[in-house]
């Protein structure tokens, strides 16, 4: 049991050093990848509401935005919302699918560090 705990801890530490935009994971929808992208590119604005950025899990803020349609949110994520939201959240290596997964991750409140 102790050996498993040590191995799990080591795997978690190694996983935290992976650059999410260059990960070799085959499943882009994996929550851990979304979390890594969120922490590297989205956290600094969205966690603290910089320039009105909706925080992960802020149901009221996300519901207001979702009323425009999820497609609009994804388009805004991809192309940005000048002057406050840069295109792709500055994650140039992120695919549209990566951004869609991170968007869902934030809407459902899994982004908190």
Which residue stretches match the model-derived regions?
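Short pre-active-site segment immediately N-terminal to redox-active cysteine/selenocysteine motifs
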Residues: 38-41, 49, 69, 81
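Short N-terminal segments immediately surrounding and downstream of signal-peptide cleavage
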Residues: 24-40
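C-terminal segment of classical bacterial N-terminal signal peptides
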Residues: 13-20
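Axial heme c-ligation environment in periplasmic c-type cytochrome domains
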Residues: 55, 76-100, 106-113
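Gly/Gly-Pro-rich "capping" loops immediately C-terminal to redox-active cysteine motifs
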Residues: 46-75
């Amino acid at each position: 049991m102790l050996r498993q705990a040590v191995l799990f801890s080591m795997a978690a530490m190694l996983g935290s050093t992976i650059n999410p935009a260059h990960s070799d994971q085959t499943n882009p929808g994996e929550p851990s990848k979304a979390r890594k992208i969120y922490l590297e590119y989205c956290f600094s604005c969205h966690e603290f509401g910089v320039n009105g950025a909706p925080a992960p899990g802020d149901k009221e803020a996300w519901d207001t935005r979702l009323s425009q349609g999820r497609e609009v949110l994804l388009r805004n994520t991809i192309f940005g919302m000048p002057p406050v939201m840069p295109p792709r959240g500055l994650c140039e290596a992120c695919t549209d699918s990566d951004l869609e997964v991170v968007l869902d991750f934030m809407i459902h409140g899994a982004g908190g560090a």
